[in-house]
From Swiss-Prot:
Its EC number is 4.2.1.109. One of its GO terms (cellular component) is cytoplasm. It comes from Xylella fastidiosa (strain 9a5c). It catalyses: 5-(methylsulfanyl)-D-ribulose 1-phosphate = 5-methylsulfanyl-2,3-dioxopentyl phosphate + H2O. One of its GO terms (molecular function) is methylthioribulose 1-phosphate dehydratase activity. The gene is mtnB. This is Methylthioribulose-1-phosphate dehydratase. Pathway: Amino-acid biosynthesis; L-methionine biosynthesis via salvage pathway; L-methionine from S-methyl-5-thio-alpha-D-ribose 1-phosphate: step 2/6.
Length: 218
């Protein structure tokens, strides 16, 4: 990644470098929390109207460098970078295409998220109700509400999964979803918003799993 903008690039390389540092710091904290095991997980930030900064595939999230953050267009194609973006890039870019206000998408694989995805796969969703922390989600101003978190079937065909996500987005507002046996996607208008949604869902999923244990269901 060059220190100055290259005229041949269709995006601002300085901006990409800034976002790389912003993402690397946050991703490192997620890695320390154990949410990105074995090079899993991928993270992105809107670069401009037509491009996204996203993690390169297969990199250890504990020790990322600028070269581990690349640019893709809104179709998920690499732009100005020799490396390959995450196989799940389409799940990021579909959100940026659909919602111009979205600025950041986070995909993690914590133990809590993965176990919850298995437990609730049959139901197809998890209903989070009457938690004070529901106020952490954009558009929620009271605990007296219910947030449905979808659980999608895992597939290696990202086009199929993206279509399923789009279909549900036509029906309901959501700030995250689980993939069975996989992990969780969260997003927001800013990195801070996306992180708040991620941390809130992580905590609430942990609450739900602990309630199931206390009631003898797990």
């Amino acid at each position: 990644m060059n220190a100055t903008s290259t005229p041949s690039l269709p995006y601002d390389a300085n901006r990409l470098r800034e976002l790389a540092h912003l993402l690397i710091g946050t991703i490192g904290e997620f890695a320390q929390a154990g949410w990105t095991p074995a090079t899993s997980s991928n993270f992105s930030h809107r670069l401009d109207e037509h491009h996204v900064a996203i993690t390169v595939s297969g990199r250890d999230k504990r020790c990322l460098t600028e070269e581990d953050i690349m640019a893709v267009d809104l179709e998920g194609n690499a732009v100005g970078h020799p490396h390959t973006p995450s196989a799940e890039t389409l799940l990021h870019t579909q959100l940026y295409r659909r919602f111009p206000e979205i600025g950041c998408v986070l995909h993690t694989h914590s133990l809590t998220q993965t176990v919850a995805s298995r437990v609730y796969a049959g139901a197809g969703h998890i209903s989070l109700k009457d938690y004070e922390l529901l106020k952490a989600f954009e558009g929620h101003s009271t605990h007296e509400t219910t947030l449905d978190v979808p659980v999608f079937c895992n597939t290696q065909n990202m086009n199929i999964l993206a279509a399923q996500v789009d279909t549900l987005l036509d029906k309901q507002r959501m700030w995250g979803y689980l993939i069975n046996g996989h992990g969780m996607y969260t997003w927001g208008n800013t990195l801070a918003d996306a992180r708040r949604h991620l941390e809130a869902l992580e905590f609430l999923l942990h609450c739900e799993l602990n309630l199931l244990k206390l009631r003898g269901y797990l």
